[in-house]
């Protein structure tokens, strides 16, 4: 720890890794002077599973079902970056319909992630009612996911060159019905929460981050935009079809926990706006680039080769990564989710580096909680919005 313990009246408290307010298995060693926080040291790694090394010993096709375990509340984004990196590396074009379907799924996943941030965040502050309200809307999103992908979570829906299946009959009407219903729900949240004096007392001026600090610490997502920096990769990188829709980057200049709350509430509204435009303008055509299915040219087999030992052998699809390197990124609900990919003319990536937004955003926590009260730790930690699956990887 950074502070030498010279005073005898200081108290050291362990928060986590098993704690009802902890967002996953995070452990904080907090040094207290009464109720004032003197120092805070996060202890990470309880959920480390070696995901980068696993990626370097699998083909992209084999690895794809596993990536949903990074951020298991925004699984569409982990799938998106996993297929985007090889697509950019090999310059694979995806059909326009597939791109629109991806945008719809990504924005639905963004809303679901923000909802499951809002409920526990309010519960941390002592408000139980919104915690139950958010599950009502979140279940409707998961019903849409289940109808389109077959799974409520861990969808395994994105593919290199498109998506796994087209949208089923009647899905678009159900999606539009949800959008109309959810906009009324957001208004209900704001009436219930935003002007609540107890809520404002807990979040206003708590966990302040200036714009310069946010940039210097490498923060991204709502953490960055709440400090006055208008930076959204959907506008900056123009990936998928985001440049074909009319929407605004949500940002605030106050830089406190209230600003981060307002940014996420605004993002849910903008996501609905994007979904409505995408659903109404979705083009026809294929949902997958079928040329990519050929992946790798099969070698000429010999009669004594392994291929002929089993009559029913069906080789798994392979995708050879050329000898290049690139950095791909998407705007996930928690910030910039990136992949640094190095290929070396083999089926496995030579290097697969994950840049998780939660891991970077969590680094500023000790600075934010110093000189604050003990009860403010959960407010600040909740406003950061972390999932330990992607922090520890």
Curated annotation (Swiss-Prot):
GO molecular-function terms, A-Z: NAD binding; oxidoreductase activity, acting on NAD(P)H, quinone or similar compound as acceptor; quinone binding
Membrane protein topology class: Peripheral membrane protein
Subcellular location as annotated: Plastid, Chloroplast thylakoid membrane
Cellular component terms (Gene Ontology): chloroplast thylakoid membrane; plastid
Superkingdom of origin organism: Eukaryota
Top EC class of this enzyme: translocase
Keyword Cell division: no
Pfam families cross-referenced by the UniProt entry: Complex1_49kDa (PF00346)
Chemical reaction(s) catalysed: a plastoquinone + NADH + (n+1) H(+)(in) = a plastoquinol + NAD(+) + n H(+)(out); a plastoquinone + NADPH + (n+1) H(+)(in) = a plastoquinol + NADP(+) + n H(+)(out)
GO biological-process terms attached to the record: photosynthesis, light reaction
EC number(s) given by UniProt: 7.1.1.-
Protein task: NDH shuttles electrons from NAD(P)H:plastoquinone, via FMN and iron-sulfur (Fe-S) centers, to quinones in the photosynthetic chain and possibly in a chloroplast respiratory chain. The immediate electron acceptor for the enzyme in this species is believed to be plastoquinone. Couples the redox reaction to proton translocation, and thus conserves the redox energy in a proton gradient.
PANTHER family hit by this protein: NADH DEHYDROGENASE [UBIQUINONE] IRON-SULFUR PROTEIN 2, MITOCHONDRIAL, NADH-UBIQUINONE OXIDOREDUCTASE 49 KDA SUBUNIT
Misc. remarks from the entry: There is a 56 residue fragment from the N-terminus in a second position on the plastid genome (corresponds to 9311163); it is not clear if this is transcribed.
Similarity remark: Belongs to the complex I 49 kDa subunit family.
Subunit comment: NDH is composed of at least 16 different subunits, 5 of which are encoded in the nucleus.
Protein name from the UniProt record: NAD(P)H-quinone oxidoreductase subunit H, chloroplastic
Source organism of the structure: Oryza sativa subsp. indica (Rice)
């Amino acid at each position: 720890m950074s502070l030498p313990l010279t005073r005898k009246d200081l108290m050291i408290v362990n928060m986590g890794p098993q704690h009802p307010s902890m967002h996953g298995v995070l452990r904080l060693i907090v040094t207290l002077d009464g109720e004032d926080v003197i120092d805070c040291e996060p202890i990470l790694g309880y959920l480390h599973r070696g995901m980068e090394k696993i990626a370097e010993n699998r083909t992209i096709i084999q690895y794809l079902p596993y990536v949903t375990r990074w951020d298991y509340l925004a699984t569409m984004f982990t799938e998106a970056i996993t297929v985007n990196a090889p697509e950019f590396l090999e310059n694979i074009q995806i059909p326009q319909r597939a791109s629109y379907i991806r945008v719809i799924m990504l924005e639905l996943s963004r809303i679901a992630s923000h909802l499951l941030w809002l409920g526990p965040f309010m519960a941390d502050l002592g408000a139980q009612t919104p915690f139950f309200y958010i599950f009502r809307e979140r279940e409707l999103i998961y019903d849409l996911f289940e109808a389109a992908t077959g799974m409520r979570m861990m969808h395994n829906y994105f593919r290199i060159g498109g998506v796994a299946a087209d949208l089923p009959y009647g899905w678009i009407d159900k999606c539009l019905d949800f959008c109309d219903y959810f906009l009324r729900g957001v208004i209900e949240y704001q009436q219930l929460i935003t002007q609540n004096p107890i809520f404002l007392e807990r979040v206003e001026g708590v966990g302040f981050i200036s714009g310069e600090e946010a940039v210097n610490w490498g923060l991204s997502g709502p953490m960055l935009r709440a400090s006055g920096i208008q930076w959204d990769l959907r506008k900056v990188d123009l990936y998928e079809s985001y440049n074909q829709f009319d929407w605004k980057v949500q940002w605030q200049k106050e830089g406190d926990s209230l600003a981060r709350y307002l940014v996420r509430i605004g993002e849910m509204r903008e996501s609905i706006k994007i979904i409505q435009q995408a659903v109404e303008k979705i083009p026809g055509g294929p949902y997958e680039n079928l040329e990519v299915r050929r992946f790798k040219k099969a070698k000429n087999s010999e009669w004594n080769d392994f291929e002929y030992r089993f009559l029913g052998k069906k080789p798994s699809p392979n995708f050879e990564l050329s000898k290049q390197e690139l950095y791909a990124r998407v705007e996930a609900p928690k910030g910039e989710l990136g992949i640094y990919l190095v290929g070396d003319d083999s089926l496995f990536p030579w290097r697969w580096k994950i840049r998780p937004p939660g891991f970077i955003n969590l680094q500023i926590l000790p600075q934010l909680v110093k000189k604050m009260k003990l009860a403010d730790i959960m407010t600040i930690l909740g406003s950061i919005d972390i999932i330990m699956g992607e922090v520890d990887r």
